[in-house]
Amino acid sequence: MKKIQKINLAVFLAFIVFTIPLSYVLGSDFMGRQEKPWHMQGSVHEDSLSQEYLGKYKILDKVPVTLQVERSKEKRVLILIDAWGVPFDEKKMAKEFAIFKDVPHEYAIHKRLKNVTKHAELVEFRTDSTESIVAIEKLSRLDSLLMNSDYKTVALTINDSKEGSEESLRNVLNDIAELMKKFPDVQFIVQGAHRPILGTPETRREYYAHWVPVVIGNF
């Protein structure tokens, strides 16, 4: 191999050695600045509740709510509401909680590990073998069931709000509040199953990823 060829080869190899790491660094930086698809994006501080929430509400950890709330009545109703989450805007949360202001209540925020309704049902509706429990599908059945049965615990998942409609959610909350007033001797534990996930990406990003509201009524 001629001397000039050796020099050219050495220059070429040096160029390759230099450009490969540089292209990796620049490429990584470029990719890091690209906007990810909505399902890969995390909300800002999505798992860190604001000081406003921490100072105003009782915070329940990832242990099932039903194990953290003492039974205060002979009968108890456990309600999961699909797509009821904790918004970054605390004032919005306060308006939803205020629907229950006319019944004895306690508000709380609960850590929910997964955004899946079935997971919430498995976690919250587990019961001791000595305790009778019945699961129903419609809120309209609850009235007659509480009046005409001896069940100690009734469990219900409400899907009316699963599409993320705020109007549907408020209607559901109002109906539950009216039942609390009608049955003051029944303890109600109402909580979100997970944040809204079927709406627009913008709507999803308005909520904490793994926190849900809890209302304990007639406690």
Predicted regions and their residues:
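Membrane-interface segments at or immediately adjacent to transmembrane helices
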Residues: 24-94
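Generic signature of intrinsically disordered, low-complexity segments enriched in small/polar residues
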Residues: 15-18, 27, 33, 41, ...
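Intrinsic disorder/low-complexity signature
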Residues: 5, 26, 36, 44, ...
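Solvent-exposed soluble domains appended to multi-pass membrane proteins
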Residues: 64-219
